[in-house]
Amino acid sequence: MTSSLDTDILLVGGGIMSATLGTLLHQLNPELRITLVELQAEVATESSDGWNNAGTGHAGYCELNYTPQDADGSVPIARALKINAAFEESLQFWAWLVEKGILREPASFINPTPHSSFVWGEKNVAFLRKRHQALRAHHLFADMEYSQDPAVLQQWMPLVMAGRDPSIPVAATRVAYGSDVDFGSLTRQLVQHLQGRPGFKLLTRHAVTGLKQQGSWQVKAVDLSQGKPVEIRAGFVFLGAGGATLPLLQKSAIQEARGYGGFPVSGQWLVCHNPDVIHQHHAKVYGKAPLGAPPMSVPHLDTRIINGKPALLFGPFAGFTTRFLKRGSLLDLVNSVKRSNLKSMLGAGRHHMDLTRYLIGEVFQSHQQRMAALRNFYPLANESEWSLVSAGQRVQIIKQCEHQGGKLEFGTEIVSSADGSLAALLGASPGASTSVPAMLEVLQRCFSPQLQSAAWQERMREMLPSYGQSLIEDAELLRAVRYHTLSRLKLT
């Protein structure tokens, strides 16, 4: 027998995006009936899980791929500014949630971890110096430090400097109030709070099998624990299911989804098992990506706090896969090819063969080869103290392109229906770090009339003090907001 339920808001996927949107909507209108559907037995088991993502509070401080050097030698910083301002919005919301007791102690999900970029060789040192000069001239990056002094770098990153050839020039930048974020813990806390509110339902072990718009959205699902069909009628649907989002978006048949495809990329970490080594490193040290590597593969020696315990990771090592989820099917990629996106998929595949070859090469790397990559960052690394652990899946966006048929894009994108009744988040990187501004975009697209009301405007400014203003343009606002969030989240 089919069970049925009615809901105002249906969130598909129990990750950080759905948890953030559900929390925002509940704070804006506590009367809304909100239902969250998750395939697994618990929320935050895929890309939001601590072991499945970089955990970096992506603020553009250390990620060199956000500021690639132009042919003329200049270093454009516009993308880094945008990402930094976006992360500041996330920090503001989290700080407010801590103040209200919705999130527990900040250390339960976010911890101060300096963000550093590290390079070696004359050419790379010159690039990092230019990058620092360009960024530090802007108020968002005014606190960024730079040094070529090995003694200073020894203090910032002792593991990185120990045993290094002193004849090779090195340089590093550092922002002391960078952060490590356990998005799994953050997601679970947000969902736990929603579970205590009237009108919220969490349906785990439920698989969405179809959705069709007939006035409201008619969503078909299966309760996997009982093998029973479920029908859900929803006024608004958000697809935030990570790699499963694209197939669900295709099932929706909205016009705006035409032409979109996905390119799955897997990830792996080298994880240290020696507590003495782990406690000697306290930073996220990012380097330059190898030639041909996708941006989510920028190598870094990474301090993490996962489920309250310190960890030390190096990677990620990307790889080629046909799965869209870590626990997905090998047929995911093939099944995603439709008549509406065939041209896009073929065009992107034809023009990105170098990336495919790179990813396949990464898959067949030996442990010794991965250790050699690690020793660029930790010269004295002992092979016996590190092992390989699988990370999460990323499905990069493929879009229609007039000149190439299709193009591969690295980033995130909101796709929404013309009537605002459905929205989906595609892509990855910077991903979870910008969950708040990403979900604000969903509100702007799909709840525009309500968002313009005096009540919602007032509530938004309470939750995000910089709402409606530009942190990129307003230095005084940035200083005030940053002082408050860093203090409230105990990042300084």
UniProtKB/Swiss-Prot annotation:
Pfam families: Mqo
Gene3D superfamilies the UniProt entry points to: D-Amino Acid Oxidase, subunit A, domain 2, FAD/NAD(P)-binding domain
InterPro entries, per the entry: FAD/NAD-bd_sf, MQO
E.C. number: 1.1.5.4
Metabolic or biological pathway, per its Swiss-Prot or TrEMBL entry: Carbohydrate metabolism; tricarboxylic acid cycle; oxaloacetate from (S)-malate (quinone route): step 1/1
Record carries keyword Flavoprotein: yes
Chemical reaction(s) catalysed: (S)-malate + a quinone = a quinol + oxaloacetate
Example GO BP: tricarboxylic acid cycle
Keyword Flavoprotein: yes
Record keywords, A-Z: FAD, Flavoprotein, Oxidoreductase, Tricarboxylic acid cycle
Cofactors named for this entry: FAD
Listed GO MF terms: 2-hydroxyglutarate dehydrogenase activity; L-malate dehydrogenase (quinone) activity
Family statement drawn from the similarity comment of this UniProt entry: Belongs to the MQO family.
NCBIfam families the UniProt entry points to: mal_quin_oxido (TIGR01320), PRK05257.1-1 (NF003603), PRK05257.1-4 (NF003605), PRK05257.2-1 (NF003606), PRK05257.3-2 (NF003611), PRK05257.3-4 (NF003613), PRK13339.1 (NF009875)
Designated name of the protein: Probable malate:quinone oxidoreductase
Organism of provenance: Methylobacillus flagellatus (strain ATCC 51484 / DSM 6875 / VKM B-1610 / KT)
Upper lineage: Bacteria, Pseudomonadati, Pseudomonadota, Betaproteobacteria, Nitrosomonadales
